[in-house]
Amino acid sequence: MSSEDQFTSIQWDRDDGENTNNTPTDTTIKSKSSKSKKSKKSSSKKKNGNKISPSSTTETSDADDTMKEVTDQLESTQINDDNHEVDDGNKEQNVDANQIGNSDEDPTNSLLLPVNPQPKEPQEEKEDLQQQLQQPQQQLASIQQEPAPIQPPFNAVVNDESLSIQQQQQQQQPTGYVDISYYEKYSIKTTVTHPNRDLDTASKPFISYLVTTTTDNPSILKLTKEKKPKQGEEYLTFSVRRRYGDFRYLYESLSNDFPTVMIPPLPSKSNFKYLTGDTFSSEFVHKRLHSLDRFIRFILQHKILSQSSIFHLFISNSNDWATFTTSLKLKDSSSDESGIVGRVVNEDLITETVMNFLTPSKHKKETNKDILEINDKLKKLYENLIKLDKIFTKLKKKNHELGNDYDQFSNQILKLSSVQKGEDSIMTTNFKIFSDSLNYFSKSYNEMYRYIDENFLISLQDLAKFCLRFIQLIKLKNDKSTDLAVLQDFLNKELANNSGGSGSGSGSGGSGLHQPPNPVISSYQGGIVNNTTQLIKDTLSTSNTTISNTIKSDKIKNLEQEIAKETKILTDLTNKIINEEYPNWEKFNKIEIKNSMLGLCDQNIKFYNDLLEKFGEVEMKLIKRLDEDM
């Protein structure tokens, strides 16, 4: 196929596509394109005759020419759309003339092609375009003409506003926020009792403690298996067993969620008993039991901690706590594999300690009178608790030794009764009665020793630890105030340096900026290299002046923002310590000391009452024996 035939077939295909799409065409454009076709045909004939390029080259060039013609035609149609109404008569005449004049050359006029339907008139095409352009305007007008929404009643508006305010408040609430409205409405009573030795999945022994809760708090009831109290009962009582590791998870979670709240300390796990292997002795287990029970009591009387979701999950009898602790174990094992040094060493704590050590002492002085008074009270209370602990530790040892002595004394009296067994039965009976009384006295002393050692002394030691923990909270506040004072001094220095630099430069330019270097030749000629070096230095210093001033202003702005942030944190922490944490701690401390002293008094009263009853019986028996002998 020659290049002319190829061009004709391409033109036919193009015209078929135009006819099927019913796109209006201008015959004047066709006449122009026909002229270009003739010239291109002649050029293609020349190229074929001279054999300059192969047929593939002519095919690609013809295809490119057709694409250019199509684009030219589209552009011309877009340009002539606006003039369709004016030139309708001329276009009809041009169509007839072009159809007659170009019937031999234009393949669209060939008799071989089917008769095409009449294309749309230019007026109709213009109307279609106008309708398409008017669609977005109509949509906009319809939106603007929509009727106003019906106003809801006043109560509905108020409810919607209250809901929106509540949502905003929930969004503004911090992560550790707890709703304390349930603290006054509902009651929670939890005790830790009955330690028991169990085996885990790896057959390793451990001690579990029975945590019994009685409550009507709905946030706790929904976590339990029962979901609600029994019919006719107001409170629901349920129990669950927890081991020491569960208490440790609770403590760490509360410490992370409430860093500015006084969290009671747990009994230390790094005890000497763990090295000796005596971790399952009755003495050690009961000491830990009383400490854990006191830990729970402190949480119960705290408005925030008692209403925390993690504590509710801890005391509930559902299986969600096991899932929670398992996920924590997996997270800890996957996140930290740097060994014991990486787990124990706290980089932030080391940095804070070093920085506070290097900080001048003038910033470490406390100025708040309330904080100073609280700190003094805590230190005095701590010293008194330590003194009581030392005194009762000595008394405990004395009681323990005295109990052993009475035990040995009763054994010796019992031996005397066995010696006198064959000689005098009356003396033997009297020795047995007296030996039993001494044995009872020894057991009573041992019970007194056990109570002082496992309960009373542990309460004093725990309260002393609570004092230290509260002192640490005050120390956190002091560290924040020290940081704030250091930041304020640093800001003052920056402002002074900035004002000094601007004052020195204001004499020449008034704006605090250095003037550009002047090419003044000094009397000393140091050579081209020295002069060029000095010029470069002056230029660099001048170019850096604006940047350095911008950096200084940004630094001052950042310092002011940080100071405002630290001031707010410090104010909130100070108010919380004075108005919330210390009154709560003082109330708990008074109750615990009172209960400990009352418990010690009750134990002593019981001890001496039992001795009076026992020795009264012994005295009556001995007097009766003497009367019989008389």
Swiss-Prot record:
SMART domains: PX (SM00312)
Protein name: Sorting nexin-4
Location of this chain's protein in the cell: Cytoplasm, Cytosol; Preautophagosomal structure membrane; Endosome membrane
Membrane topology note: Peripheral membrane protein
Entry keyword set: Autophagy, Coiled coil, Cytoplasm, Endosome, Lipid-binding, Membrane, Protein transport, Transport
Feature: compositional bias, Low complexity: 50-60, 130-143
Taxonomic superkingdom: Eukaryota
Species of the source: Candida albicans (strain SC5314 / ATCC MYA-2876)
One of the GO BP terms on file: piecemeal microautophagy of the nucleus
GO molecular-function terms, A-Z: phosphatidylinositol binding
